[in-house]
């Protein structure tokens, strides 16, 4: 039943571009809160050791809903590879912008025979 409601809401929202009525918005909010509550209860039933070994999606939901807790630390990535990828991306973007700006002033004369 819940999946049918979720499918109906998603299909209505994305198919016609129609703005949801107040009833539909309220039903969607209730559904979302219920799903979040169920996930929190599921995490609470698991032990603290099992919670750390849980899936990444559960951890994201727990982190998103418990963002006000004192347990959450600074949001700094500790993954070396990801940090290197971010730095490489920034360097590539800055380099491409510099290359574009440097080449923008040069106009090659057309050779006509």
From Swiss-Prot:
Specify where it is mainly localized.
mitochondrion
GO molecular function per UniProt? copper ion binding
Transit peptide feature range: 1-14
Q: Where is the signal peptide?
A: none
Cellular component (GO) terms are: mitochondrial membrane; mitochondrion; nucleolus; peroxisome; plant-type vacuole; respiratory chain complex I
| Sequence segments annotated as region (Disordered) | 41-79
**GO BP, one example?**
photorespiration
Positions with biased composition (Low complexity): 55-73
Recite the UniProt keywords alphabetically.
Mitochondrion, Transit peptide
Cell compartments where the protein resides: Mitochondrion
Instruction: Write the protein's name.
Output: Uncharacterized protein At2g27730, mitochondrial
**Species this chain originates from:** Arabidopsis thaliana
- Please spell out the taxonomic lineage of the organism that makes this protein: Eukaryota, Viridiplantae, Streptophyta, Embryophyta, Tracheophyta
């Amino acid at each position: 039943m819940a999946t049918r409601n979720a499918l109906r809401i998603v299909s209505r929202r994305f198919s016609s571009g129609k703005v949801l009525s107040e009833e539909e918005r309220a039903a969607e909010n209730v559904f979302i809160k219920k799903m979040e509550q169920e996930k929190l209860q599921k995490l609470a039933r698991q032990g603290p050791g099992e919670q750390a070994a849980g899936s990444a999606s559960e951890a994201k939901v727990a982190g998103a809903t418990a963002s006000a807790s004192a347990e959450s630390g600074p949001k700094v990535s500790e993954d070396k590879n990801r940090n290197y990828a971010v730095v490489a991306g920034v360097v590539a973007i800055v380099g491409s912008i510099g290359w574009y700006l440097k080449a923008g002033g040069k106009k090659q004369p057309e050779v006509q025979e």
